[in-house]
Amino acid sequence: MSASEGMKFQFHSGEKVLCFEPDPTKARVLYDAKIIDVIIGKDEKGRKIPEYLIHFNGWNRSWDRWAAEEHVLHDTDENRRLQRKLAKKAIARLRGTGKKKRRCRLPGVDSVLKSVPVKEKSKNDENSVSSTCHESCGEKNGGIKEHRQRRIKVKAKAKKKVLSLRSRKEMDERTITIDIPDVLKKQLEDDCYYINRRKRLVKLPCQTNIITILESYVKHFAINAAFSANERPRHHHAMMHTHMNVHYVPAEKNVDLCKEMVDGLRITFDYTLPLVLLYPYEQTQYKRVTSSKFFLPIKESTTTTNRSQEELSPSPPLLNPSTPQSTESQPPTGEPATPKRRKAEPEALQSLRRSTRHSTNCDRLSESSSSPQPKRRQQDTSASMPKLFLHLEKKTPVHSRSSSPIPLTPSKDGSAVFAGFEGRRPNEINEVLSWKLVPDNYPPGDQPPPPSYIYGAQHLLRLFVKLPEILGKMSFSEKNLKALLKHFDLFLRFLAEYHDDFFPESAYVAACEAHYSTKNPRAIY
């Protein structure tokens, strides 16, 4: 591109000049150069300025640079003296930092520095080291001090960018694997077959919803952690020396981490379900069950009555089984009456409540374990309880007419099942056993509940197929990621152990039946 008429240029094509390296990170010296071409460019403010294509003598053509007029000087005696002065300052600076070889890697730098006579170098070295930055290059752009600060900023910015790119690359290359047990892999295959081939749907709302599953797992986890707590001092004396804190709890036995994990699963599930966890055949059902027309708000008077009845019940909630109980039999006269909230409610209003609030059933189970009940009642209870809740019921005996839900000290014969809770405060134990994933007033009565209140284990299991991809886009330290994956592994083992309870084949129904189950409005609880 040729220079336009009307603009004056101080230099012309083919002229020999002295030029600064345009890159501020390079050595601040003047190089012998030659102008190859002249064009009209624009500065940062959009104004037209002349630009010169500079070829540095002795440099490869790849180092040719476009330079503004302020970086170019005429080849005069005065500018030659400035060139030698800057070269001497560069020598002194490089000697002071001890990085001469690394600083003078570019072609042309050595030739400029060697052009200074040896005697002149020796004579002025001491003055060069002690001279100020304004003396060294006050003629151009503020001096060496300003140049050095600018260079430090550029390097820091470049280093930060490199670290960011490296971190992003490591995240892209990091492979996260979640091992799903074989029985659950088969469940995923069956789930796909039922939905896509047989055109069946999971009946919603599920009798055992995700909130129930996650809450039950935390209590299951806490009980197992408590049982192993008293074994750790006997079998792991070396751990006391490794961890000076006597209250150290491994990540895989930390109840607080377990609570955080299940809460994270709940939040992730509610967000990702409509995005990646539903088959196309299920989209219509999802829109129907999440519609505000599908749910009815509960009256405050009913909620207040139920709460007052819960406060009168002496038995604390130990577990949340989601199995319906018979309402024909009544508790004995000597026992306090437990709330019977479902007796007067139509079946349509009970389905969602079974899956979200079920401490009443636990109270009845606790009383039946210590008080004589009719034979038919005991058989019905045992037959209707899932194996998970029967298993935990054996581990959590409760004495009727007693405010303490569990024995806090082991028996003399050593058969107390809660020896692991030895030395712990009763309120800590009750807090774990009565812990709830979400508060009682959630969700608000005027809003439909989130998917975790409606869907069950079938859709929760699908989340673990997508979790590696989701976690790969999050920033985790290796330590935190390892602990999280360990808790995922324990939770999947829990689902596999009670597979028959959480994944019944009867959960899949024909589309017409699934549509009928969502035809009438349901109550939010």
From Swiss-Prot:
Protein location: Nucleus
Phosphoserine modification, residue list: 313, 315, 371, 404, 411, 415
Annotated Tudor-knot domain residues: 13-72
Region annotation Disordered: where it falls in the sequence: 119-148, 302-383
Keywords: Chromatin regulator, DNA-binding, Nucleus, Phosphoprotein, Transcription, Transcription regulation
Pfam short name (any one): MSL3_chromo-like
Compositionally biased intervals (Basic and acidic residues): 136-146
GO BP annotations, alphabetical order: positive regulation of DNA-templated transcription; regulation of DNA-templated transcription
SUPFAM superfamilies assigned to the protein according to its UniProt record, in alphabetical order: Chromo domain-like
Disrupted-gene phenotype: Mice with a conditional deletion in male germline do not show any phenotype: spermatogenesis is not affected.
GO molecular function: DNA binding; histone H4K16ac reader activity
PROSITE patterns: MRG
Ranges where the record places region Required for the histone acetyltransferase activity of the MSL complex: 294-444
Biased segments, Low complexity type: 320-332
Tissue: In testis, expression is mostly restricted to the spermatocyte stage and only in a small portion of spermatogonia.
Residues annotated as domain MRG: 172-521
GO cellular component: MSL complex; nucleus
Chief localization: nucleus
Modification Phosphothreonine, positions: 409
PANTHER family reported for this sequence: MALE-SPECIFIC LETHAL 3 HOMOLOG, MORTALITY FACTOR 4-LIKE PROTEIN
Function: Non-catalytic component of the MSL histone acetyltransferase complex, a multiprotein complex that mediates the majority of histone H4 acetylation at 'Lys-16' (H4K16ac), an epigenetic mark that prevents chromatin compaction. The MSL complex is required for chromosome stability and genome integrity by maintaining homeostatic levels of H4K16ac. The MSL complex is also involved in gene dosage by promoting up-regulation of genes expressed by the X chromosome. X up-regulation is required to compensate for autosomal biallelic expression.
SUBUNIT field: Component of the MSL histone acetyltransferase complex at least composed of the KAT8/MOF, MSL1/hampin, MSL2 and MSL3. Interacts (via the MRG domain) with MSL1 and KAT8/MOF.
Protein name as catalogued: MSL complex subunit 3
Gene giving rise to this polypeptide: Msl3
